[in-house]
Amino acid sequence: MDLINELHQRNLIFHITNENKLKELIKNKYISLYCGFDPTEDSLHVGHLLPLITLKRFQVLGHKPIVLIGGATSLIGDPSFKTKERLLKSDSFVEKCTLKISQQISFFLDFNSNFNSAIILNNNLWFKKINILQFLRDVGKYFSVNALINREAVKKRIKRSDQGISFTEFSYNLLQAYDFFILNQKNQVSLQIGGSDQWGNISSGMHLIHRISKKEAYGLTLPLLMQSNGIKFGKTESGTVWLDPQKTTPYRFYQFWMNIEDSNVYRFLKLFTFIDIHEINEREKNSYKKNQIVSDKVLLAKHMTRLVHGDEKLSAAERITNILFFKNINDIQISDLEQLRKDGVPVVETYKIKDLQEALVLSSLAQSRTQAKNMIISNSISINTKKIVNKNYIIDDNDKLFNQFTLLSRGKKNHCLIYWNK
């Protein structure tokens, strides 16, 4: 199967230019392709995984992936389908973010291959060398303002009475077009990939290459993933799901995939994993069987957590899951409890709680001591996964894991971690 056909079967293609020519090109030679990432935050998030994994799919088959960090363009901000002007970032902030996301990207691609090693570039390399008059003369003259303002992303902003679009953001399209042109000239890049919201920017790059160099370049966009509630993929009630384990713990990351809607399980297995497409289709055919979807969610969560955080962090996420959902606390490690303390479950810090009823109220697992007493009597409360039925139970040192933590649970899904201050 050729790569473009596989991308179609995995539902990875939203737009593609000159598909037959691109198929022929990558069939007959190895190409260089790129995707850009603006360092507007100090971590990538799960929404960035799709383009990174797609770059990897090309690299596995011999093509050379280039990651372009928008050290210059991030100072402007991409207006594509944004409802309002982005806040401008400082140079120092962008530099810090560039370093961090470059380190994250290094885990996804092979930078030590014989002939198609991935490389990371920063568009500061060329934008710091070009002045505004040169840019307007050499780039701006190839673009019609009429065409630019008719781009869907720009039109939406112009039509809003409360939010227009500044010339700063309006110029972003030309800056990204120039990126593609430079990479085509210097690195023989013939394909740019990105989210479907990047179609206008990619098209401008192809246009500029054709006008100046008389060469044909190609574009491929990936679907923007939305949840059924209309919220962008990767956003939860508790915020963005980051790739940085200091911002989203591996356990919380693992649970994000476990909690996706059933209707997305096989779609995401196709989009995000390298599991054979035929195996995924077979799994989907059997999804009516008892526990099959849950089993396949586990497969997805394992694959993604291993990909982003590695085997050790995956094991920790599985241990924590076993504690909270399957009451298996035997293999718990203090680092697992530190993960839970960071963003796994609600946390109460104290040094003086004595009785269980007070602990349940303080942890918000109960609204009152009376309710707490009734919960204990009805066999709903556990300490460190052990059921407690004594309504007058006093918490002591034996209930402290590693002399620092106590896990309170109400039923199967409501937990709170007590952290004992010394």
Curated annotation (Swiss-Prot):
Q: Note the PROSITE patterns from the entry.
A: S4
**Which EC class is the enzyme in?**
ligase
Q: What is its EC number?
A: 6.1.1.1
Question: What Pfam families is this protein classified in?
Answer: SYY_C-terminal, tRNA-synt_1b
Q: Where is ATP annotated to bind?
A: K235
According to UniProt, the reaction catalysed is:
tRNA(Tyr) + L-tyrosine + ATP = L-tyrosyl-tRNA(Tyr) + AMP + diphosphate + H(+)
Give this protein's Gene Ontology molecular function annotations: ATP binding; RNA binding; tyrosine-tRNA ligase activity
GO BP term, pick one: tyrosyl-tRNA aminoacylation
Residue ranges of domain S4 RNA-binding in the record = 354-412
Q: Which UniProt keywords apply?
A: Aminoacyl-tRNA synthetase, ATP-binding, Cytoplasm, Ligase, Nucleotide-binding, Protein biosynthesis, RNA-binding
Annotated L-tyrosine binding lies at: Y34, Y172, Q176
Task: Kindly give the InterPro entries that the UniProt entry links to this protein.
Answer: aa-tRNA-synth_Ic, Rossmann-like_a/b/a_fold, S4_RNA-bd, S4_RNA-bd_sf, SYY-like_C, Tyr-tRNA-ligase, Tyr-tRNA-ligase_bac-type, Tyr-tRNA-ligase_bac_1
Gene Ontology CC = cytosol
Which residue windows are coiled coil? none
Q: Motif 'HIGH' region, which positions? A: 39-48
Spell out the subcellular localization from the entry.
Answer: Cytoplasm
In chain numbering, where does the motif 'KMSKS' region fall? 232-236
Describe the family membership recorded for this protein in Swiss-Prot or TrEMBL: Belongs to the class-I aminoacyl-tRNA synthetase family. TyrS type 1 subfamily.
Function according to Swiss-Prot or TrEMBL:
Catalyzes the attachment of tyrosine to tRNA(Tyr) in a two-step reaction: tyrosine is first activated by ATP to form Tyr-AMP and then transferred to the acceptor end of tRNA(Tyr).
Subunit relationships: Homodimer.
Q: Which NCBIfam families match?
A: tyrS
Protein's recorded name: Tyrosine--tRNA ligase
- Species of the source: Buchnera aphidicola subsp. Schizaphis graminum (strain Sg)
